[in-house]
A protein has these predicted regions:
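Classical Sec-dependent N-terminal signal peptides that target proteins to the secretory pathway
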Residues: 1-20, 30
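Extracytoplasmic "Venus flytrap"
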Residues: 28-46, 65
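Extracytoplasmic ligand/sensor domains, especially the bilobed periplasmic-binding protein
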Residues: 88-152, 156-171
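Glycine-rich, charge-decorated loop segments at or immediately adjacent to ligand/cofactor-binding or catalytic sites
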Residues: 120-124, 185-189, 273-285
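Short, well-structured alpha-helical segments in soluble
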Residues: 71-87, 139-140, 189-198, 202, ...
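Short beta->alpha junction loops
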Residues: 63-73, 77, 127-128, 176-184
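Extracellular/periplasmic periplasmic-binding protein-like sensory domains
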Residues: 171, 194-219, 234, 238, ...
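Signal peptide-proximal N-terminal region
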Residues: 45-66
Length: 319
């Protein structure tokens, strides 16, 4: 959170506004303080209060206003900030609430969204976006000398954001596939991508060939072949899956079913915030993904819990 305030100070200097020691710096906060996302809004405010204590600057005053996770309410609150003479605002949290903020041109908004498509000129995205993550993945591919990478992108509302990140990072890849997250369709799609049917048939054909051969060791050869699921390799050495949670697990499980294992192919995904449920799935390991510093995350979580007696949502870390 200290980094966030550093950005604000840079923005303050860039606007050529002079502050004396007695001048109070007013910073607005747009967060969902009511409605179904109110608990997240509360966590964001608590995180900002912790940051203020850490930076020990009594000249900063925070003014929170409710967005109710609604674009119209967000605009009304932003216009109230404008009347107060506030020019810098943390928030809003969600991309949908940025819709009308180009009408408040006197304010710079440091939004917590990780989406960067079609942002208004007065909005800065401070979330962990796809471009920054893909740049990190690109370095990993280069240092690991991984040559043939495929992208698996779900047909969801952020697929254009991912494709923009791929273009900006100039990451080299072999092929790119979109897939339907519907479990009844997913496995068939992964089978096609991995040529599972051909590789499975290759195995059956080889078993049949050996059975009909005069090889004196054919029983042993057949025994070894029957331990396999497929015969023949896939045309890639790494998979980047731009998915999360249960949907991500379903994709990796489908890859395992088609005899593509993390033990012989690199399975790479986006930041999973150290998802414990994912880490506990031993058959899905190893998985590679970019992340924030684990030690810093643990320190933030412990500090937050000690002060407020509950664990924070990781989105509040960005504030």
């Amino acid at each position: 959170f200290k980094i966030l305030f550093s950005i604000f100070f840079v923005l303050l200097f860039e606007t050529s506004v002079s502050y004396s020691e007695e001048t109070k710096i007013k910073i607005g906060v747009l967060a969902p303080l009511s409605g179904e996302d109110a608990s997240l809004g509360k966590q964001i405010l608590n995180s900002i209060r912790m940051a203020l204590i850490d930076i020990k600057d009594n000249n900063i005053e925070i003014y929170p206003k409710d967005t109710r996770s609604d674009p119209d309410m967000t605009l009304r609150s932003a216009l109230e900030f404008e009347k107060m003479g506030i020019s810098l605002v943390i928030g809003p949290v969600f991309h949908k609430n940025l819709l009308f903020l180009d009408k408040v041109k006197s304010i710079t908004f440091l939004s917590l969204t990780n989406k960067t498509l079609d942002l208004h000129k007065n909005i800065i995205s401070s979330g962990i976006n796809s471009s920054s993550q893909l740049n990190t993945i690109k370095k990993f591919l280069e240092t690991s000398e991984i040559k043939k990478t495929i992208f698996l992108i779900p047909n969801l509302n952020y697929d254009l954001e991912i494709k923009k990140g791929i273009k900006e990072s100039k990451i080299k890849f072999f092929k790119q596939y979109n897939y339907d997250i519907d479990p009844t369709k997913l496995t068939k799609q992964i089978e096609k991508i991995t040529n599972y049917g051909i590789r499975k048939q290759n195995l059956l054909d080889e078993i049949s060939r050996v059975e009909n051969s005069d090889d004196p060791n054919k029983e042993k050869i057949i025994e070894n072949l029957e331990k396999k699921y497929t015969l023949g390799n896939v045309k890639f050495d790494s998979v980047i899956i731009t998915d999360f949670d249960e949907s991500l697990k379903s994709v990796i499980t489908s890859l395992l079913y088609t005899d593509v294992s993390p033990k012989n192919k690199y399975i790479i995904t986006l930041n999973q915030w150290f998802d414990e449920s994912l880490l506990k799935e031993q058959n899905l390991q190893p998985i590679y993904y970019p992340s924030i510093n684990k030690q810093n995350l643990d320190e933030f979580t412990n500090k937050f819990f000690k002060k407020f007696n509950y664990k924070p949502n990781y989105l509040s870390l960005l504030s």
